[in-house]
Swiss-Prot record:
Binding, Mn(2+) 2: 306, 311, 359
Protein name: Phosphopentomutase
Protein family (similarity comment): Belongs to the phosphopentomutase family.
Binding site for Mn(2+) 1: 10, 347-348
Subcellular compartments: Cytoplasm
Keyword terms, alphabetized: Cytoplasm, Isomerase, Manganese, Metal-binding
Enzyme class: isomerase
InterPro entries reported in the protein's UniProt record: Alkaline_phosphatase_core_sf, DeoB, Metalloenzyme, Phosphopentomutase_DeoB_cap_sf
UniProt GO BP: 2-deoxyribose 1-phosphate catabolic process; 5-phosphoribose 1-diphosphate biosynthetic process; metabolic compound salvage; nucleotide metabolic process
Cofactor: Mn(2+)
Pathway assigned in UniProt: Carbohydrate degradation; 2-deoxy-D-ribose 1-phosphate degradation; D-glyceraldehyde 3-phosphate and acetaldehyde from 2-deoxy-alpha-D-ribose 1-phosphate: step 1/2
Enzyme Commission designation: 5.4.2.7
Cofactor note: Binds 2 manganese ions.
């Protein structure tokens, strides 16, 4: 029975890539800087001491980081016995965003340039805004700028509740984000507005990767909270991913846990499971792994590393999240059967010690574990698509156009 379990620790980079200068990210290192802060006692909020990731270390994380950066992460064990295969991978795609990283993992790098709304104020074209107001029958809109998602709620949340005007904002990513109150505006109405925005962006040729619904609750600035009902409306990948090939060519199954289905615009997904928060995502993943049959991929995105801690530049939170994940990792490993493979990876970096709030251009870890996987270094990989090609070979689908089999 062949099954693959892919766990994306969203934003868990392990050191800047050779082309990081194009992005202003030279020296970024998500794992390294978290470990450094922990070793110095600067991340003792809600946790304590050096970064403690014994299970990820056994799978080769510290070795992969050393391969990427040339140094052992502060306070971590560079001499631990390694029971998995490990690599550090460079991104071929032109961006450092979520869809590019995930599509490339599935064998389809993004070699075109996304469209962006680069103006920090009055970010969106008036023609687009006018169409949204008219089609969705809106009383107007708020925002129309670059912002952090939590900051903009404190600034405009109360006015949104009073006026019913949705909050439109963007970032350095190729995104159009819409924040609305779940109760006063309504979740269904927000989703409908996002569908309209997706249509207008596509028809207008803006080439924007995602429209993101950002629902929130609360009654005043300071206590607004985003809920787990986020929804991403992505464009479809430009070519069949290994997920699609498994389903189409092998009548296989692909189970999405978390936001995976949204990222691939539901292409190649046969079952969707929603969960919010690290523990809930972990629990849902374990359940799906236990139920998975032959020719199945269970694919989970652990978004909190990025959304709650990376973008928020919360080093202690990120460290605590990693330690929680590591504590629970044996539960996953126990479910890996004789012919199965477990792949732990990331989609980009988001160094919580870095300036600004955006992603960072970094190598990602590729940690592969299974009874038939030979432990040791798989070295530097030139593209995340090596993961997709490895899966294509493993499941016996037609080969991907990019990437090399690692096993």
């Amino acid at each position: 029975m062949k099954r693959a379990f892919i766990m994306v620790l969203d934003s868990f980079g392990i050191g800047a890539t050779a082309d990081a200068d194009r992005f202003g990210d030279v020296g970024s290192d998500t794992l390294g800087h978290i470990a450094e802060a922990c070793a110095k006692g600067e991340a003792d909020n809600g946790r304590k001491g050096p970064l403690n990731l014994p299970n990820l270390t056994r799978l080769g994380l510290v070795k992969a980081h050393e391969g990427s950066t040339g140094k052992i992460a502060a306070g971590m064990d560079g001499n631990a016995d390694v029971i998995g295969a490990y690599a550090w991978a460079h991104e071929l795609s032109s961006g450092k965003d979520t869809p590019s990283g995930h599509w490339e993992i599935a064998g389809v790098p993004v070699l075109f340039d996304w469209g962006y709304f680069s103006d920090h104020e009055n970010s969106f074209p008036q023609e687009l805004l006018d169409k949204l107001v008219k089609r969705a029958n809106l009383p107007g809109y708020l925002g129309n700028c670059h912002s952090s998602g939590t900051v903009i709620l404190d600034q405009l949340g109360e006015e949104h509740m009073k006026t019913g005007k949705p909050i439109f904002y963007t970032s350095a990513d190729s995104v159009f984000q819409i924040a609305c109150h779940e109760e006063t505006f309504g979740l269904d109405k927000l989703y409908e507005l996002c569908e309209i925005a997706r249509e207008e962006l596509t028809e207008g040729g803006y080439n924007i990767g995602r429209v993101i619904a950002r629902p929130f609750i609360g009654d005043k600035a300071g206590n607004f909270q985003r809920t787990g009902n986020r929804h991403d409306l992505a464009v479809e990948p430009p070519a069949p991913t290994v997920l699609q090939k498994l389903v189409d060519e092998k009548q296989g199954h692909v189970v999405s846990v978390g936001k995976i289905a949204d990222i691939y615009a539901n292409c190649g997904i046969t079952k969707k499971v929603k969960a919010t928060g690290l523990d809930a995502l972990f629990d849902a993943t374990l359940k799906e792994m236990k139920e998975a049959g032959d020719k199945t991929i269970v694919f989970t995105n652990f978004v909190d590393f990025d959304s709650s801690w990376g973008h928020r530049r919360d080093i202690a939170g990120y460290a605590a999240g990693l330690e929680l994940f590591d504590r629970r990792l044996p539960e996953l490993m126990e479910l890996v059967g004789e012919d199965d493979i477990l792949i732990l990876t990331a989609d980009h970096g988001c160094d919580p010690s870095w300036t600004g709030t955006d992603h960072t251009r970094e190598h990602i870890p590729v940690l592969i574990y299974g009874p038939k996987v030979k432990p040791g270094s798989l070295g530097h990989r030139e593209t995340f698509a090596d993961i997709g090609q490895t899966l294509a070979t493993y499941f016996g689908t037609s080969p991907m156009d990019y990437g090399k089999n690692m096993l």
